[in-house]
Design a protein with these regions (language model features):
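Non-heme Fe(II)-dependent double-stranded beta-helix
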Residues: 7-14, 27, 41-94, 101-203
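A structural signal for well-ordered alpha-helical segments within the folded catalytic domains
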Residues: 166-170, 216, 277
Length: 348
């Protein structure tokens, strides 16, 4: 009986490995994979406790090396030299996240917030119960989350300044040890709707499995975020693959995990709430377990930039041209790092 189960498991793993290999071939040739092959990567990650993803990360460093060396640069978050960027990348490798000491200027945050207040967002993130686009009302939200459309985000000059900041492409490249591309930008409101966790709004513990094998998300608070207004919560160290304590949780598949199970597996002392004033910036390897804490009162406005290795970031089938009002700083950054903006061609 035991031998039979082992043979069955080996057969399942072999099938998933074939699907994952097919996904990699598709990614190398066209920048995306079909859904079935992509799911094979995800299930293989869960069944191998991250070993398959770790192997793919090593391969990507060979297949897609960094296209340019790091150089010193100026950022809204300060001046960075090469060693400073590498030190931050190393801290992310250790802890899974990093909170920058400096903040985005209030003027930039306020400009984005003003645009977001007058822009319709998509409430709810529930594909089974879609809601019409609506303006977010912080006093009476109809859903726990309102997503601003990505094309509209690129129209906001303040957000363009954030995208143009070289810290994001440089730090992600240093962290990956490989080429880094901008996958997407996001902007959403989170509102208080009773303080109950909403799984569609990512308010229960989970790991991301976005454009494997490695990605890095940058979050910017555009409003003051306190423990009561929905801070990001991360499990320190949970991003490191092949951990024995993660094996049982990952074996459940791509599901939401209770606070109690996370605390038992990783220790309550490693559950970190990231509160901060407007303009706070932090980087997170979201293959680690994380969630957005449901706001108990007030609201949260959050920006997100996601960088990834280019294996599964399509630039042909899902392009989004830069807007006609692209700021000179954004155009200059795109010219300096053309590979990073492959999905975002210049409008003609």
């Amino acid at each position: 009986m035991i031998a039979s189960r082992k043979l069955q498991e080996a057969a399942v793993l072999a099938g998933l490995a074939r699907g994952a290999a097919r996904a990699v071939r598709q990614g190398l040739y066209r920048g995306e994979a079909d859904h079935q092959s992509w799911m094979a990567c995800l299930h293989l990650h869960c069944r191998t406790n991250g070993r398959s993803t770790e192997l793919l990360r090593r391969v990507m460093k060979i297949l897609r090396p960094s296209p340019a060396p790091l150089r010193p640069f100026e950022s809204m978050l300060g001046r960075f030299d090469v060693q400073g960027v590498r030190t931050i990348a190393e801290q992310i490798r250790t802890d899974g996240y990093y909170v920058f000491k400096e903040r985005i200027p209030d003027s930039v945050c306020n400009q984005i917030a003003a645009a977001a207040r007058s822009t319709e967002g998509l409430p709810g993130r529930n594909p089974e119960k879609p809601q019409p686009m609506a303006i977010f009302d912080p006093a009476n939200p109809d859903a726990s989350v309102y997503d601003i459309p990505e094309a509209r985000i690129w129209q906001i000059p303040g957000y363009q300044r954030i995208i143009a900041d070289p810290i994001f492409v440089n730090l992600s490249q240093a962290y990956f040890g490989a080429a880094s591309v901008l996958k997407q930008v996001n902007l959403w409101w989170s509102g208080a709707v009773g303080g109950q966790a909403d799984t569609n709004a990512a308010q229960l513990f989970h790991f991301d499995f976005d454009p494997a094998p490695i990605w890095l998300k940058f979050f910017i608070y555009l409003s003051d975020v306190t423990p009561a207004t929905g801070p990001h919560v991360f499990v320190k160290g949970s991003h490191r693959l092949r951990q024995p304590r993660a094996s049982e949780i990952l074996s459940r598949g791509y599901v939401r995990i209770s606070d109690e199970d996370i605390a038992e597996a990783y220790g309550r002392e490693n559950i970190v709430e990231l509160s901060g004033p407007k303009g706070t910036v932090f980087a997170v390897d979201t293959i680690g377990f994380h969630k957005g804490k449901p706001p108990e009162t007030g609201f949260r406005l959050l920006a997100q930039l996601e960088y990834a290795t280019p294996l599964f970031v399509a630039s042909v089938s899902d392009p989004l041209p830069l807007p006609a009002n692209a700021e000179p700083q954004l155009l200059a950054t795109r010219k300096a790092y053309p590979w990073a903006f492959a999905r975002f061609p210049i409008s003609v």
